[in-house]
Curated annotation (Swiss-Prot):
Mod. after translation: Phosphorylation by PKC at Ser-180 reduces conductance by 50%. Phosphorylation by PKG at Ser-111 in response to glutamate increases conductance by 40%. Isoform 2: Palmitoylated on its N-terminal region. Isoform 1: Not palmitoylated.
Its membrane topology: Multi-pass membrane protein
Disulfide bridge map: none
Glycosylation positions in this chain: 153, 206
Protein name: Aquaporin-4
Native organism: Dipodomys merriami
Length: 324
């Protein structure tokens, strides 16, 4: 006899089921529209990083540095993202931010498979955009290439909280501006998002560099090899984005149909936890009665005529008392 274990009869079926699950998860990935969207995210991030990081270059160099113009930097970042959203929003949704993409996954607006490609394209675009800026900028003034760093007088925890807050306000603005259920939004959605980015920069440039976008921090970090506290610019924005998306989508402005389906699901779950009851015959006595026994749990013998409850035995055979 062979020592080789016998193959399970459902082995092929299980393998087939797994393949089908993968195909369902990646449904829509192998389409022309999908790859256009991924390319749009890549190109939008490349242009955004190239233009916005260019505003952080100090052309005075290390010897004669010019004063940092926070208004210039804030407006450049805000107007750049607004322009990219206006240009590519109808193609890919205009995420241009891994934190926004994660928030969209958590609110079931895009699939996990799609988000993986989006985030990869965003990070690649950020690297290439930062690389192009590095190549076209004189070495004497390139400086840190806009790498985001936490202020020296702040701890990593402070930086994390600041990034969480400014990303929260950005993503909440995105969800509120793009809500298809609203009829009162008459202005430019792209401009509203751009203003939100600008506000975040005006507040937080001196604190953390005001990233709000993991890919924006990832690109220059790769080019310059500076990874100090880099994790803050992933964890903070993603937590802030998920909180903002979840609060808007499920608390402040929930979808009526989604709310109804959630309520039905919770109702069914509650009914299942109560247990199922069935009418059975009482074989403990030779006297014919109209007693009703309820199972599972303690066995209750209820006299229907008198409306009171007699002592019964639980399934283990011990006398049981039920209090109401």
């Amino acid at each position: 006899m062979s020592d080789r274990p016998a193959a399970r009869p459902w082995g092929k079926c299980g393998s087939l089921c797994r393949r089908e699950e993968i195909m369902v998860a990646f449904k829509g990935v192998w389409t022309q529209a999908f790859w256009k969207a991924v390319t749009a995210e890549f190109l939008a991030m490349l242009i955004f990083v190239l233009l916005s990081l260019g505003s952080t270059i100090n052309w005075g160099g290390k010897e004669n540095p010019l004063p940092v113009d926070m208004v210039l930097i804030s407006l450049c970042f805000g107007l750049s993202i607004a322009t990219m959203v206006q240009c590519f929003g109808h193609i890919s949704g205009g995420h241009i931010n891994p934190a926004v993409t994660v928030a969209m996954v958590c609110t079931r607006k895009i699939s996990i498979a799609k988000s993986v490609f989006y985030i990869a394209a965003q990070c690649l675009g950020a690297i290439i955009g930062a690389g192009i800026l590095y190549l076209v900028t004189p070495p004497s003034v390139v400086g840190g290439l806009g790498v985001t760093t936490v202020h020296g007088n702040l701890t990593a925890g402070h930086g994390l909280l600041v990034e969480l807050i400014i990303t929260f306000q950005l993503v909440f603005t995105i969800f509120a501006s793009c809500d298809s259920k609203r009829t009162d939004v008459t202005g430019s959605i792209a401009l509203a998002i751009g203003f939100s980015v600008a506000i975040g920069h005006l507040f937080a440039i001196n604190y953390t560099g005001a990233s709000m976008n993991p890919a924006r921090s990832f690109g220059p970090a790769v080019i310059m090899g500076n990874w100090e506290n880099h994790w803050i610019y992933w964890v903070g924005p993603i937590i802030g984005a998920v909180l903002a998306g979840g609060l808007y989508e499920y608390v402040f402005c929930p979808d009526v149909e989604l709310k109804r389906r959630f309520k039905e699901a919770f109702s069914k779950a509650a009914q299942q936890t109560k247990g199922s009851y069935m009418e059975v015959e009482d074989n403990r006595s030779q006297v014919e009665t109209e007693d009703l026994i309820l199972k599972p749990g303690l066995v209750h013998v209820i006299d229907i005529d008198r409306g009171d409850e007699k002592k019964g035995k639980d399934p283990s055979g011990e006398i049981a008392q039920t209090q109401h």
